[in-house]
From Swiss-Prot:
Enzyme class: ligase
TGS domain residues: 1-61
Keywords assigned: Aminoacyl-tRNA synthetase, ATP-binding, Cytoplasm, Ligase, Metal-binding, Nucleotide-binding, Protein biosynthesis, RNA-binding, tRNA-binding, Zinc
Residue ranges, annotated region (Catalytic): 242-533
Protein name from the UniProt record: Threonine--tRNA ligase
Annotated compartments: Cytoplasm
Source organism: Azoarcus sp. (strain BH72)
Function: Catalyzes the attachment of threonine to tRNA(Thr) in a two-step reaction: L-threonine is first activated by ATP to form Thr-AMP and then transferred to the acceptor end of tRNA(Thr). Also edits incorrectly charged L-seryl-tRNA(Thr).
GO terms under biological process: threonyl-tRNA aminoacylation
Gene3D superfamilies: 3.10.20.30, 3.30.54.20, Anticodon-binding domain, Bira Bifunctional Protein, Domain 2, Threonyl-trna Synthetase, Chain A, domain 2
Amino acid sequence: MPNIKLPDGSVRSFDHPVTVAEVAASIGSGLAKAALAGRVDGKAVDLSYCIERDSELAILTDKSAEGVDVIRHSTAHLLAHAVKELFPEAQVTIGPVIENGFYYDFSYKRPFTPEDLEAIEKRMAELVKRELPVEREVWPRDKAVAFFKSIGEHYKAEIIASIPANEDVSLYRQGEFVDLCRGPHVPSTGRLKVFKLTKLAGAYWRGDAKNEMLQRVYGTAWAKKEDLESYLHMLEEAEKRDHRKLGRQLDLFHIQEEAPGMVFWHAKGWTLWQQVEQYLRGTISRHGYQEVRTPQIVDRSLWEKSGHWGMYSDLMFTTQSEKHDYAVKPMNCPCHIQIFNQGLKSYRDLPLRMAEFGSCHRNEPSGSLHGIMRVRNFVQDDAHIFCTDEQVQEEAAAFIALLQKVYADFGFRDIQIKLSTRPEKRVGADEQWDAAEAALAAALKAQGLEYELQPGEGAFYGPKIEFSLKDCLNRVWQCGTLQLDFNLPVRLGAEYVAEDNTKKFPVMLHRAIVGSLERFIGILIEHYAGAMPLWLAPVHAVVMNISEGQADYATEVVNRLREAGFRVEADLRNEKINYKIREHSVHKLPYQLVVGEKEKAAGVVAVRVRGGQDLGQLSLDKLIERWNGELASRSGPV
């Protein structure tokens, strides 16, 4: 009979098969009450799961992220149950857990309204009060297909029909509502008391624009009311900081229907872009990278050799010319190998660091596009390092140090790191994987960095490190990547002459620090709420005259500051100075400079810092000294 090992190392022995719920009860009444699900030998299961042999067990409660995910998954089913009670003709499709919440897609004859959302949430609360048991049932696949067809749930029947015929499927029943799901779920709807439906959207069935547009309902669920309130407050702040809204308000960029997923950068937005790109360009140049430029449109044959045509052709923009098929490049790596292959390379030439701010195009589904965060045309701070196996650790360590410096300069110091190791299906010898994984781990440890290990999550062609930064709202953005590649140099014939005079394939390190510049600038806009530090600000200051008599002096000030290298504008309109100050405050400029008769006579300016701080009168020399200090330290008012 089963001996059950708990996370603290203790073992509980039973003389009969036992459920997860019974094990929890044997430990204590408090745990029995708090238990939501379990994890048996690494597999998440319901409390009703019966353990028949020796196993390792962890009881999941709402104190763990995994337990909260069970709550969210169950709340998605609660949402579907409520929709079916209120709108019986609606068909259910899928309802996964996502970061901080969940969604469920429905097929219905009309779009849901905000009033519908309120009614659905109210019905969900009623279902919670009923404390309906949530029970798992296992059916033969064909029986499940027939059942869902019989009740008019054709999408669900289609999903189940794609499962092999000899497999059983698990269903969950709560009251009259039955849904397909692997589970696990909470034992009763009464455990789902803290939730909120947040928004409505459209989504194509299976993400294909040729299919029906479904109604997507988003929601969030938490263990405690305080957690929900904190999250909703964060959403309010995020709404205020929405880069799309600030992009219009600050005259940075726009996107229009004639070019979906492609950005029209306005003068101020392009100035911001240039500050980011020029900083990155200067930084990588100082660290030994050679910047290159490769074609936008490349013959299909290269993409077939690289393997991208088979994997990415649906996401490629293609064209034809003179009976040849071409693709607008979705990434730079195959083209960089073409440069590497020009001329014989020796081990003495390695490591070779090749960078490109390459413009890439990917035909992302229209429903996934989001401002400048998710686009079809983007530029990456892309680079590839060609090196020997022995050089991997040193190159990885240098890149990690560089990445930390860049993130810190942009104001991000909280970085999360994940190391993904070999998957079951892979290329390359185990010895090469052993060395590569050890090199990446050693590079991280050399920097004193903690990381999360993700066994089996690496690409088939090499292990990788992912770097995510946390913004001022504690949102996590995955930006940086260091991906080892044992495959592409072999496929595209990249070779070098080794020290023993034999030809070998280099290891290729794909690396990016900020990733898509468009997305990173969107992150910056939201992180700073549009109030950029001086070094990034599109306009450093505006000079405003109090009356017409100071117009010439205001112009002199603008010219002097521009000659000193600053981005300064003049506002010489015949408007009251307080009106000008209020208007430019909306534009979030770091500084406002006011000149009246006193300032003109003394050859100074009255300086107001963003946020309203009054620095009084400063000479232009003092102001330039202050600004140069802020630029050098990449600081300034935020």
